[in-house]
Amino acid sequence: MRVVILGSGRGSNAEAILKAEQEGRLGGARVVQIFSDQPAARILELGARFGVPAQFLDPGPFKTKFDEAGETRYLETLQACQPGLIVLAGFMRILKPRFVGTFPQTIINLHPSLLPCFPGLDAIGQAWRRGVKVTGRDPQSDQRLPPPPARRSRESVHPGWPWWFPTRV
C-alpha cells in the first residue's frame, strides 16, 4: 500500500511511521511521499533521513484551511501519488467534504485528544489546563465526531506529568 503523510510541524508521528516501515512493521505498506503546508516544518527533514521525497506544498493564504486553489493543488498532487492511505500526522488544516470525498476511506487523522473534547489546535494543552483525568488519541478515518470507540486510545493522566507527556504514551 502506498502511504502519503501530510504534516505541519516537527513530524514525531511521521517519524514513528517511518521507523515502523524501516523495521518491517507496516505489513508491506510504504511511505512514498511527505508533504507539508509549512515551508520550514521539521517534518520535511525526515524525507532525507528516511529516503522519502518530502516537499512543501502551498495551501494558500489561510492559516487553518485551504483556499480553493490550494485545495485543488493538494488534491491533484495527492491523486498523482496514488495513495492507498493518507495519514494526517499533525496536519493543521481543516479538510472540507470535497477533500475527504476525493479519497473515501483513505484518510486517517491522528488527533491528540478524545474527540469531540478539545478539537483543533493545542488539544493536549487544552486537556492539561482543564485538569482532565483521562486523555487519549483519536484516529479519524471519516467525518464522524467522535470516531468509533474501537479506534480510540485512552490514557490516564497522572499528577506530576509534564503537559506534553500524554503525547509520548
Each model region followed by its residue ranges:
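One-carbon transfer enzymes
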Residues: 1-169
